[in-house]
Amino acid sequence: MTKRTESKYKINRRLGVNLWGRPKSPINKREYGPGQHGQRRKKPSDFGVQLMAKQKLRGYYGNISEKQFYKYYEEAVRRRGDTSENLIELLERRLDAVVYRMKFAITPFAARQFVSHGHVLVNGRRVNISSYQVRDGDVVEVREKSKQLAMVLDSVQSAERDVPEYIEVDHRAMKGTFARAPKLADVPYPVQMEPNLVVEFYSR
């Protein structure tokens, strides 16, 4: 088991939820945190509830760094409209998130690595920055040389997840389009996400 995989499962155990809905996650058997005292759970304070909401959202998108996550919050505040909805939109526009939604990778962690290794094209050009912001109408596809990779084929054929309505994808061509910006209600999170609590956490 790699360190990346270990950290992924520790995130699930620490937060007490199966963030990505994976059937083999250890949290399905042990609903408490890692370590000797993992079974001790106290009723969280308001701060604790807000912190948990932030950690869940950060963790879901591949455990984004706190610095980068806070930048998303700042950008969400600057934009017009509901800050919590803006935050979700910014996260869902990440290239690795779009690759994950198109089912070209089995987890957000795998999607980030897939992008950084240069396997993905956006509008015909290779982009290896996982945080790249995909725009409405952008075409995202797997490079020709990468279409037969086992990890891609396994993910596409997996029945674990469905492609959301704001994504259009042709799995035979390994190509898809980011059709529109999603709202929170559109995003198929396996667990409840509360971006409003994230906003409360940062605006304290």
UniProtKB/Swiss-Prot annotation:
SUPFAM superfamilies reported in the protein's UniProt record: Alpha-L RNA-binding motif
SMART domains: Ribosomal_S4, S4
Region (Disordered): 21-45
Superkingdom of the organism of origin: Bacteria
Pfam families: Ribosomal_S4, S4
Record-level GO cellular component terms: small ribosomal subunit
InterPro entries to which the protein is assigned, alphabetical: Ribosomal_uS4, Ribosomal_uS4_bac-type, Ribosomal_uS4_CS, Ribosomal_uS4_N, S4_RNA-bd, S4_RNA-bd_sf
Cleaved signal peptide residues: none
Gene Ontology MF term list: rRNA binding; structural constituent of ribosome
GO-annotated biological processes: ribosomal small subunit biogenesis; translation
Keyword vocabulary terms for this entry: Ribonucleoprotein, Ribosomal protein, RNA-binding, rRNA-binding
Domain called S4 RNA-binding: residue spans: 93-156
Role summary: One of the primary rRNA binding proteins, it binds directly to 16S rRNA where it nucleates assembly of the body of the 30S subunit. With S5 and S12 plays an important role in translational accuracy.
Protein name per Swiss-Prot or TrEMBL: Small ribosomal subunit protein uS4
The organism of origin for this protein: Acidiphilium cryptum (strain JF-5)
